[in-house]
């Protein structure tokens, strides 16, 4: 959303009038006819159009440094990206300050989200054999997805290579409503993608009375 300065043009034209020249003659000689008046001067050329002012450079967006969006993108950067490139899941999660826990009988690593509620957290799951995909489970304040999505938008923009937005929609369902935002860089030979899926009841209310839930997936693939 850029604005360009518009320059105004003011044309000024002037006409110069010349006095008729007269010559004096000998008294005995007939007077010479008066010289015709000088032709009117040509109007001055209008000034050249001013060049438009240079557009101000748009500042690069920056990732937030606090809030849930900052926590989530920090896990993406420090855990997910190096993990799909072959990094060790346990070592990366531990180095990012995540704590070992169990969920549904499986070992996971968790990191608190903001709000001071123990149920608000990011959960990193063991990738198992599918090491090209990093899967995060998010439990956050009810209706608290907006700052997370804003942060993911910036993260995808700053990602190298840039990942443009691909989806922002939902699929109606009788059991769980899935609202999807996705970003992807792809060529004929590779894909780097980010998918954020909110999980809600069909009427849009939370699945859990205490928090909202979402799944966040990051992947890198070659073909």
Task: List PLM regions with ranges.
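Compositionally biased, proline/threonine/alanine/serine-rich low-complexity intrinsically disordered stretches
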Residues: 21-66, 200-207
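Short, surface-exposed beta-strand/loop "edge" segments at domain boundaries and coil↔beta transitions
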Residues: 116-120, 140-150, 190-195, 205, ...
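Sec-dependent N-terminal signal peptides
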Residues: 1-22
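Glycine-rich, aromatic-bearing surface loops/beta-hairpins
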Residues: 179-223
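Extracellular/secretory pathway and lumenal proteins
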Residues: 84, 137-139, 200
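Long, charged/polar, surface-exposed segments that mediate recognition or autoinhibition
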Residues: 117-184
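N-terminal secretory signal peptides
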Residues: 47-53, 65-128, 185, 223
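Hydrophobic beta-strand residues in large extracellular and virion-surface proteins
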Residues: 98, 109, 121-123, 136-138, ...
């Amino acid at each position: 959303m850029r604005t360009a300065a518009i320059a105004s043009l003011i044309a000024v034209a002037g006409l110069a009038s010349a006095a008729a020249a007269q010559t004096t003659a000998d008294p005995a000689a007939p007077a010479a006819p008066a010289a015709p008046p000088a032709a009117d001067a040509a109007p001055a050329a209008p000034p050249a159009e001013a060049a438009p002012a240079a557009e101000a450079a748009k500042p690069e967006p920056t990732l937030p440094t606090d809030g849930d969006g900052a926590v989530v993108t920090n896990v993406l950067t420090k855990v997910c990206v190096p993990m799909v490139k072959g990094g060790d899941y346990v070592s990366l999660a531990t180095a990012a300050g995540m704590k070992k826990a169990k969920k549904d009988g499986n070992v996971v690593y968790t990191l608190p989200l903001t709000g001071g509620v123990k149920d608000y957290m990011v959960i990193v799951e063991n990738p198992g054999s599918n090491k090209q995909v990093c899967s995060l489970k998010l439990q956050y304040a009810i209706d608290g997805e907006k700052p997370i999505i804003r942060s993911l938008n910036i993260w995808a923009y700053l990602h190298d290579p840039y990942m443009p937005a691909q989806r922002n929609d939902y699929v109606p369902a009788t059991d769980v409503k899935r609202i999807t935002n996705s970003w992807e860089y792809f060529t004929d030979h590779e894909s780097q993608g980010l998918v954020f899926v909110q999980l809600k009841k069909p009427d849009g209310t939370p699945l859990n009375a205490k928090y909202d839930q979402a799944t966040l997936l990051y992947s890198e693939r070659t073909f």
